[in-house]
Amino acid sequence: MKVLILAAGLGKRMKSKYPKVVHKILGKPMINWVVDLGKAFGEVGVVVGHKADIVKSYLPEDVKTYLQEPQLGTGHAVMCARDFISENEDLLVLYGDVPLLSKETINKLKKEHEEQKNQVTVLTFVTDNPAGYGRIIRENGKVRIVEDKDATEEEKKIKEVNSGIYIFSGKFVLENLDKLSNNNAQGEYYLTDLVGMAERSSTVILEDIVEVSGVNDRIQLAQLETIAKQRILEKLMLSGVTIVDPNSTFIGPDVEIGMDTIIYPFTIIEGYTKIGEDCEVGPYSHIVDSNIGNEVKVIRSEVEKSVIENKVSVGPFSRLREGTVLKEKVKIGNFVETKKTTVGKNSKAQHLTYLGDATIGEDVNVGAGTITCNYDGYKKYPTYIGDGAFIGSNSSLVAPVNIGKGAITGAGSVITEDVPNDALALGRARQIIKEGWAKKKREELKNADHKE
């Protein structure tokens, strides 16, 4: 089956300079929710129009795009993607601003379509307030759709309405697409007219109409985010994850969390993040696109595009940036920042430290205030710290530099040269003591004050 997503609309009511379909729900653009759904069923194509280049920038490379310019209705959108349609495959039509449709619903639609050997199968729903929706009319075993403005008084009483989601026979679409007419008040080509041409058609009635709820403004965007968040959190809790306060916790649709992990309030977990079992995350933590092992603590910290192995402690107030890898039992503490850095097993940097472009061995102690000076204004340089090294507090390691295994740097040192294994490196001025100098200085200052 091929999947065609219609995403060319302007979205005026969003009041935005960005296309409607790139606005996010739980950190993920709506169009990507729909693309991921579509990929579960086959090759995906997207019809773009308004600010097409922006929409394209959000799409995976393997998704084909088709330009609809100008936008002359849903039927016209499918016409613009004629080259995508195959007469040997069915065509599922979805919408870029309908993000909560489920695989289960599409499977039901697909099953009905295949079992009945339909030319078109329509996803419908029943509502007590059908105003504005196309009504479903059944005649002689066929289905047609009457738009609200064209419905008779009797037809307006019908409560089963069109969701806009269809599966077509590709052959049927190619044979009948050119028969669509724009002879209507809007001067547009409607996909609903194609439904009426089918000799073999039926419907699947959707029970949960939230699945086909679209987004037209930011109020509806917020409403769908609330619903999506609730469903994701409930699924996690039913799988063995403790969410202390669901109202203040935000977890994206592509996040995986293991059982017996506890998520504390005011935590945001987004992107393709995987968290293992028996972890504690939060409060006030933000994790994006990261892989976290078992028995890990992330407290009041930021983690982005990082890998954290088992039994690691992060925070409070740590920032792990892209390319960070923390091996087992590492401790990263207060106000420590890392980027493109690997920290070996059992090593720790617990206070006021920056580690960038660094490779740190096992059992290393990085003292408070340590900085890897990795940038000269033009280029980044690496720092290597061997197993068992001890980096004294307030050390500045000027890269490129290699600290050997078991080496020690004295507190307050500026290290500009490689340090051999098991050596002590001191890069600071020698301390000078002048006996009685402070007392003498105070007396001088006191006498000067009296003279004034």
Curated annotation (Swiss-Prot):
GO function terms (MF aspect): glucosamine-1-phosphate N-acetyltransferase activity; magnesium ion binding; UDP-N-acetylglucosamine diphosphorylase activity
Cellular-component GO terms for this entry: cytoplasm; membrane
Residues that coordinate or bind UDP-N-acetyl-alpha-D-glucosamine: 6-9, 20, 68, 73-74, 95-97, 134, 147, 162, 216, 321, 339, 354, 365
Catalytic residue positions: H351 (proton acceptor)
Chemical reaction(s) catalysed: alpha-D-glucosamine 1-phosphate + acetyl-CoA = N-acetyl-alpha-D-glucosamine 1-phosphate + CoA + H(+); N-acetyl-alpha-D-glucosamine 1-phosphate + UTP + H(+) = UDP-N-acetyl-alpha-D-glucosamine + diphosphate
Gene3D superfamilies attached to this UniProt entry: Hexapeptide repeat proteins, Spore Coat Polysaccharide Biosynthesis Protein SpsA, Chain A
Keyword RNA-binding (UniProt): no
Cofactor note: Binds 1 Mg(2+) ion per subunit.
Disulfide bonds: none
Subcellular location: Cytoplasm
Pfam families: Hexapep, Hexapep_GlmU, NTP_transf_3
Known role: Catalyzes the last two sequential reactions in the de novo biosynthetic pathway for UDP-N-acetylglucosamine (UDP-GlcNAc). The C-terminal domain catalyzes the transfer of acetyl group from acetyl coenzyme A to glucosamine-1-phosphate (GlcN-1-P) to produce N-acetylglucosamine-1-phosphate (GlcNAc-1-P), which is converted into UDP-GlcNAc by the transfer of uridine 5-monophosphate (from uridine 5-triphosphate), a reaction catalyzed by the N-terminal domain.
Subunit architecture: Homotrimer.
Protein name: Bifunctional protein GlmU
Lineage: Bacteria, Thermotogati, Thermotogota, Thermotogae, Thermotogales
